[in-house]
Structure formats: structure tokens, C-alpha cells
């Protein structure tokens, strides 16, 4: 699987991408990741890193390795232009933690994007779960879709409604952040992700619209809005899973779950928070026997 020079510049230059993975119920969760330019054009692979401390994401990918990465924002990266790139593929099995690989390969690869890592007696201990237990996830690329100029949306059949119904279950989070993505499971079983406009409606739903199109019918879907500064400092994230009803480029989204996060705008405070979250997640993963 190859791709153009224009696409390669985006895969190699974007600071963040939207990782979409499939839930056990057949929905999609979208979360920003830092791909730090990881890709092998000759081998047809892309990648990103994550920590064993964030085990739920890894568990979902292990259960269903069909994933997608939406390269949708040029902010604070090295690529230019407004081309939207959606890469769909199959994630390889999660490898064991390899601190030498992280230090010697991933560290230098990440430095232009994230800045040099904090080092020293305190930081080495505090960020152990975040850095030393970090792994590179490699994705064997199946499809590279671009927009404008290409189709991002297939024609998957409607899904059966959940037992608890399709109406909104939580109050919509504000979608007034610069970057918004909506995703669902496409006809081939891979997540499909499009950029959207999103506004809360009086009935508790979120009105969504995408010039790239939406799949006709009803289905589970994931929605995310996010913003970030250089080196992902000050990352703000608002996520929903829920139910999408669409016809043409417009639809109504009923939020069923919500999650939000706002990182400190100071890098030192951000790393302190990252270390705490990763250590807590790793402790839970070990207690559950998944690490």
C-alpha cells in the first residue's frame, strides 16, 4: 500500500491525529494521539505510541484491530495545506515494553514534535509509566482516503438500536473547539471518520453536518472536539459516544456517554499530570491482569 508525496508529508508532519477504534457494541471511540511522523512508506505502515497505563484503549484494539487515523489538523506541526487524510488499517499485536527502543528510536523521533524529554532523578521515576512503559503501535495500512477529492464515507447498513434506546442520556458537551471529528464503523468494518460542524439542539441532541458526507441511516458513533498548543501543551478534549441518525450531509447525534479533559497549559504541570494518570492506569491494568 503506497501513498503520494503530498500524503507522506502530512503523515510525517502532523502533530496529532484522531485515532478511531471499534467498541464491543459496534460503535467507535475517537481520541487524539501523537503519531510523531511514524510511518514506513515502503512497508505500508503507520504508527503511534501509547502507554500501558492507558490500557482500555489497548484492550479495545486487541479485541478488534481494525483502526483508523484521521490526519486532520496542521496546527503546530510541519505539514502544510488543508488535505484531510484518513488511514485505515489493522493494528499489529501490542508488543512488550522495550525501554531501549523508546529511548533510542522513539525519543529522537518524538523530540521535534514534543520537545526533549524531561530527565533526572525525579522525572525518571515519576514518568516511568508514561515513558518506559510506552509502546509503539504499528498499523498495516489497508486504505488511504483523502478529502477533498475522494470519498470518505461508504454505505454501511443501519444498526439495531441499543436496549436502552437511542435518546440522549447525557447533556451535550460544548463542541466549540477548533477540531471536531465524527466516526462510525464503515461497510468494510473499519472506522470511518469525517470532520464535522456540531451544535447543541434544544432537544438534547447535537446537530452535525459534514461536507465530506455522513452515512444514511442510524448507528452508533463517536464524536470528539479538541484543541491544543505546541507540543500538545494545554490539550483540551471533549468526547461522546452515542447514536447518529443521518440523511445526506446532515444528522442528529444523541450523546450517550461523555468524557472531557483539559491539560495544564504549563509543560511541567502537564508532565506531572501525565505521570499521575499513566501510573494510576498501569496499576489498574496490573490489578486486572492485563499488564
Where are the regions a protein language model picked out?
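Short, solvent-exposed aromatic-acidic interface loops
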Residues: 50-55, 257-261
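Short coil-to-beta transition motif at edge beta-strands of beta-rich domains
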Residues: 13, 64-67, 176-177, 215-226
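Short, conserved active-site entrance elements at the starts or edges of catalytic domains
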Residues: 1-15, 20-21, 153-183
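Short beta-strand segments
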Residues: 14-53, 69-73, 79, 83, ...
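Charged, gly/pro-rich active-site loop segments
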Residues: 2, 78-171, 209-291
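Residues that flank catalytic or metal-binding motifs in active/ligand-binding sites
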Residues: 15, 31, 65, 85-87, ...
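Short beta-strand segments in beta-sandwich/barrel cores
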Residues: 17, 67, 91-93
